[in-house]
Amino acid sequence: MKTFTATPETVTRDWFVVDADGKTLGRIATEIALRLRGKHKPEYTPHVDTGDYIIVINAEKVTVTGNKAQGKTYYSHSGFPGGIKQISFEKLQAHKPEMIIEKAVKGMLPKGPLGRAMFRKLKVYAGAEHNHAAQQPQVLDI
């Protein structure tokens, strides 16, 4: 019997919706990253994108433990001298709450073209509404 190896043509992808209301950032991000990679499936193959599509709603209501709301800092750099910018978790949650979950999940995915393809299957929304009803997503309880 031959070892099964998934190919891009044989992969079946499902759509799941995750409610981030009151959930801890790291715990929800690890489960999302695992499902984007496809490691929960028996046909997982490391060099093939076997993961599912994940829709995250209520990103503005995600929580962090301890005093990380004030102490956690996100950095970005323009590439020019003196071009570093920083923003706290609280301010980022007020302005762009989707970015918090996106950055947490992106850091848990592989680096390179395959990781970027996996990341494209993540859809994050600040509120409770999303525009993927046509895909009939299943509710995923994390």
Curated annotation (Swiss-Prot):
GO molecular function, one term: mRNA binding
GO-annotated cellular components: cytosolic large ribosomal subunit; ribosome
UniProtKB keywords: Ribonucleoprotein, Ribosomal protein
Known partners and oligomeric status: Part of the 50S ribosomal subunit.
Function text: This protein is one of the early assembly proteins of the 50S ribosomal subunit, although it is not seen to bind rRNA by itself. It is important during the early stages of 50S assembly.
Similarity comment: family membership: Belongs to the universal ribosomal protein uL13 family.
Signal peptide from the UniProt entry: none
Organism field: Shewanella oneidensis (strain ATCC 700550 / JCM 31522 / CIP 106686 / LMG 19005 / NCIMB 14063 / MR-1)
HAMAP family per record: Ribosomal_uL13
Short name of one Pfam family: Ribosomal_L13
Biological process annotations from GO: negative regulation of translation; translation
Record's protein name: Large ribosomal subunit protein uL13
Domain of life: Bacteria
